[in-house]
Amino acid sequence: MLAAFTRRTSFLLILLMLVAATQLGWAHAILKDSTPKANSSVTGPDVGITVRFNVRIDGGRSRLHLIAPDGASLPLTIAKQDSPDTLQSQAKGLKPGAYKLIWNVLASDGHMSKGEIPFTVN
């Protein structure tokens, strides 16, 4: 009886460890790096945009847009992905002021993640 209990307990512990280990690979997208960096100042009027994440990103289902100093939302076209964890775009004709880059990305785990990067154009 004790041997059966020990076997069952061992099996359940191994199963639990396997499930926990597989979940480590299913993390939501976390921003690792960006250009421009958060709270930085950049020279305009044209600004290159790059956001890099900790996981693969579906560029076709992800979105980037800017919130301009006047509150207008400016959608950005995402360039063809050179790297599966990176999105790039180009913001043209930006006037001086405070902007927010808003990102909404579909990660490899199937979950949407979002965030914002404030920066200033000189």
Kindly give the residue locations of the regions a language model identified.
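A glycine-anchored, Pro-Gly-centered beta-turn/N-cap motif
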Residues: Q90, K95-L101
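N-terminal edge beta-strand
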Residues: A27-P45
